[in-house]
Amino acid sequence: MALDLRTIFQCEPSENNLGSENSAFQQSQGPAVQREEGISEFSRMVLNSFQDSNNSYARQELQRLYRIFHSWLQPEKHSKDEIISLLVLEQFMIGGHCNDKASVKEKWKSSGKNLERFIEDLTDDSINPPALVHVHMQGQEALFSEDMPLRDVIVHLTKQVNAQTTREANMGTPSQTSQDTSLETGQGYEDEQDGWNSSSKTTRVNENITNQGNQIVSLIIIQEENGPRPEEGGVSSDNPYNSKRAELVTARSQEGSINGITFQGVPMVMGAGCISQPEQSSPESALTHQSNEGNSTCEVHQKGSHGVQKSYKCEECPKVFKYLCHLLAHQRRHRNERPFVCPECQKGFFQISDLRVHQIIHTGKKPFTCSMCKKSFSHKTNLRSHERIHTGEKPYTCPFCKTSYRQSSTYHRHMRTHEKITLPSVPSTPEAS
């Protein structure tokens, strides 16, 4: 990460960074920290100096910065390693992830200002780790740190795309085109559930990102929500296809070109996206396996040239999906791929949403309490499922044998027993409320 010297050294330095070195640093600020009434006079002096001489202000600025660095780093007293340590610590303090500068300062002093000893004693309690960002590009997806440069993300995913294309070519399977994985502009949706409202739009992301074949590269960057979500196979929600969503926020990426991929001013769509939603079938179509999620976070209709709704069929089972992202998440189950790993217990998950739900277990937080028996739960959906024990409600009814169930997970396990003996056509039942 490049240092912005103007930001670091013209402004007041970090409060708790380097102890006594800051005194010399603050004293060298010069007239730039005068009282408010003296600012205009100083500005005129600087302007006149800049206009009347040949780049004298530029030379003065460089000399001022040299004095600041010299008085701060004191090369006559410190070795090269000590100077590097000072710069590293300063960058760590202003990097945005340090949440307890006072504690870091104390550890720096207690280590004798030795960087190696300081690193050994430093724990994650004093920093905010960078958030994880879920990136989806041309059918490939991965989890990256928010600090990772966009060019590295694109290079990594491009290698995955090329590897998959090579495998498909060897198998004689036509590869997916970029049109199949492009996300077109979807209509905004409003969702109100569990007291949570959201309104968002999914935007097609293809501006100025091209590869050597002049094909559009669609890049979706999804900021995963940390809120609780029902974990598949556990105590599930009262509606098997409801989920929380985050607003989509657009941001501008870096500019650059690498390995034939050009990306300039790439709009990045950030929000809770389709990949993070658990893949489940609705009760009405449990055996036809066609997704009917009208308010899904994949509210992106991919249509052909004649406006016909596309569908995506799994090659290993009869399931058909309306959205490509659901198919990709489903196929990971056939391959038993669990790319999302808990850093605490190393347990793998098929979907990022499952990982988020699992991580709440490690926190030990159970903020939702039953009003009848005072039992606590980590998720509101789990609480609602538990409350049905008291009310006797069983909203999930099998369309074949009319057996009712309190939890959707139990309902889906029961429906799989019918899949082995029933034709694909399934009578529909009213949606459980």
Swiss-Prot record:
ZnF (C2H2-type) intervals: 312-334, 340-362, 368-390, 396-418
The keyword Transcription appears for this protein: yes
One family name in Pfam for this protein: SCAN
Keywords linked to the UniProt accession: Chromosome, DNA-binding, Metal-binding, Nucleus, Repeat, Telomere, Transcription, Transcription regulation, Zinc, Zinc-finger
Source species, domain of life: Eukaryota
Biased composition (Polar residues): 165-185, 195-210, 277-299
GO molecular function terms attached to this record: DNA-binding transcription factor activity, RNA polymerase II-specific; RNA polymerase II cis-regulatory region sequence-specific DNA binding; sequence-specific double-stranded DNA binding; zinc ion binding
Region (Disordered): 165-210, 275-301
CDD domains the UniProt entry points to: SCAN
Entries under InterPro entries matching the protein: SCAN_dom, SCAN_sf, Znf_C2H2_sf, Znf_C2H2_type
Alphabetized Gene3D superfamilies for the sequence: Classic Zinc Finger (3.30.160.60), DNA breaking-rejoining enzymes (1.10.4020.10)
One Gene Ontology biological process: regulation of transcription by RNA polymerase II
Domain SCAN box residues, every copy: 44-126
Protein name: Zinc finger and SCAN domain-containing protein 4
Organism: Homo sapiens (Human)
